[in-house]
């Protein structure tokens, strides 16, 4: 059960980091413009953009998960 949850999270994180989304960064606001609350779409966009910067960590996590699958969750 816990192995399935860890595998699901790993695959989801890989999908977000590897897929090449054409996301644009949010425009910066100039003087005199009121700041608004970020929408859900803005939050998702920022999360996917931040995943791109963590590709090395994600690769190390994948190696760790493969080790766990062989040693701990293997039958």
Curated annotation (Swiss-Prot):
The chain's Cytoplasmic topological domains, given as residue ranges, are: 75
Which spans are transmembrane here? 54-74
Locations listed in the record:
Membrane
Position of the signal peptide:
1-17
The record's InterPro entries line, in alphabetical order, gives:
SMIM7
Domain of life of the native organism: Eukaryota
Which UniProt keyword terms apply here? Membrane, Signal, Transmembrane, Transmembrane helix
GO CC terms, sorted: membrane
- Keyword set includes Transmembrane: yes
Q: Could you list which ranges are Extracellular topological domains?
A: 18-53
PANTHER family, alphabetically? SMALL INTEGRAL MEMBRANE PROTEIN 7
Question: Which protein is depicted?
Answer: Small integral membrane protein 7
This protein's species is Bos taurus (Bovine)
Lineage, top ranks: Eukaryota, Metazoa, Chordata, Craniata, Vertebrata
